[in-house]
Amino acid sequence: MHKLMTARTNPLPTIRRTLSCYLQGFTMSRKMFLGLIVILASGCSPVSVNDYSAFEPRLVLQDFFSGPLTAHGVVKNRNGLVIRTFNADIQASWTDGIGTLDEYFLFDDGERQRRVWTLIPNGDGSYRAEAGDVVGAGRLQSAGNSLFLEYVLRIPYGESTVDVTVDDRMYLVSQAVLINESSMKKFGFRVGSIDLVILRQAGKPATHQ
């Protein structure tokens, strides 16, 4: 009788069933939650340069990128840790609507780099952006106080090279100050970023000369 009562009143099977139902419910709720996140994410449109069309001061490429400029920034790894700093001199000019940005970089470890951008108008307000270490050409678009530039950069890696996708987003905060945030990705994964400020140096010679 004692054994029968013990078997009938043993709480473990009930606990197991309750726990099993709870876990099943949790799994379903978790799946529903993740599904909701996916739906919400898919419904969010990416930020476009046109979202800033009403922002001021208005960025006119031929006005800001004209004459000597300087750039000062940091390079971060994928975790957001600063791994390099740099300063740069830029000489900008325009001829027949085509822009040239001649950039000289000096990094904190002594490395020097030069990049020459050629900006060719596409006829729709955007520009084709070409440079020696850029694969193909990038696309530059501007609206309001903003400039977006997307391109594939080929960078040295050991004895070879690696191509990374760069998303430059620049914002004019005053007539002489442009903020630039760059995101670098490989296979869709973020591998690093660059934060920098570009300053107009009207009337001042480029310091690299």
List where the protein language model places each region.
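Bacterial signal peptide processing site
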Residues: 45-47
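N-terminal helix-cap/turn-to-beta initiation motif at the start of protein domains
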Residues: 52-68
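Central antiparallel beta-sheet cores of small beta-barrel/beta-sandwich binding domains
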Residues: 72, 76-157
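Sequence-level preference for short, compositionally simple segments enriched
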Residues: 50, 88, 94, 168, ...
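Glycine-rich, aromatic-bearing surface loops/beta-hairpins
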Residues: 167-209
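Amphipathic hydrophobic-ligand
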Residues: 82-88, 161-166, 190-194
